[in-house]
Amino acid sequence: MSIVTKSIVNADAEARYLSPGELDRIKSFVLSGQRRLNIAQILTDNRENIVKQGGQQLFQKRTDIVSPGGNAYGEEMTATCLRDLDYYLRLVTYGIVAGDVTPIEEIGLVGVKEMYNSLGTPISGVAEGVRCMKAIACSLLSGEDSAEAGFYFDYTLGAMQ
């Protein structure tokens, strides 16, 4: 839930107007909107490279995944792995745009561990791929923007622990 929605829900629950502090937080959120959109645009524009390089780094670190019997062995399974990495990058951009983890949580992380366990896919490999993408994505951004994006990658990774 965004800071705007949270503030309104809280104020309404108490049958009051928004406080000066709440209005200041909403103002800061609105003013940071263009920056968040720029970060999401950079990640979106570079998504193919981020996913491809992230996958390559993952497969170099975790050769068991692409070896015979591994979950990403063969072209089709490798493509499936890269598709999943792309999905998590997309979720991160949703969080950045919203300025909140709710889209990440509600759209993509509910039951993630259970799903991968049921498929026999090591969640540690998926998490390593997301970590690789985080490093690549954050290298494309300035310090403050990198920290902003890093927060949403870290949130995603936390759900995989």
UniProtKB/Swiss-Prot annotation:
The modification N4-methylasparagine is found at N71. It is found in: Plastid, Chloroplast thylakoid membrane. Belongs to the phycobiliprotein family. Contains one covalently linked phycocyanobilin chromophore. InterPro entries: Globin-like_sf, Phycobilisome_asu/bsu, Phycobilisome_asu/bsu_sf. GO terms for biological process: photosynthesis. This is Allophycocyanin alpha chain. It comes from the Eukaryota. (2R,3E)-phycocyanobilin binds at C81. The keyword Transport applies. Light-harvesting photosynthetic bile pigment-protein from the phycobiliprotein complex. Allophycocyanin has a maximum absorption at approximately 650 nanometers.
